[in-house]
Amino acid sequence: VAPEEHPVLLTEAPLNPK
């Protein structure tokens, strides 16, 4: 699963704030 799919979990790098 790409980090772009779940940017919410990767709050350390909010590249895609959906």
From Swiss-Prot:
EC number: 3.6.4.-
One annotated GO molecular function: hydrolase activity
Membrane-spanning parts: none
Catalytic activity: ATP + H2O = ADP + phosphate + H(+)
One cellular-component annotation, GO: cytoplasm
Recorded superkingdom: Eukaryota
Family of the protein in this entry: Belongs to the actin family.
Official protein name in the record: Actin homolog
Organism: Crocodylus siamensis (Siamese crocodile)
Organism lineage: Eukaryota, Metazoa, Chordata, Craniata, Vertebrata
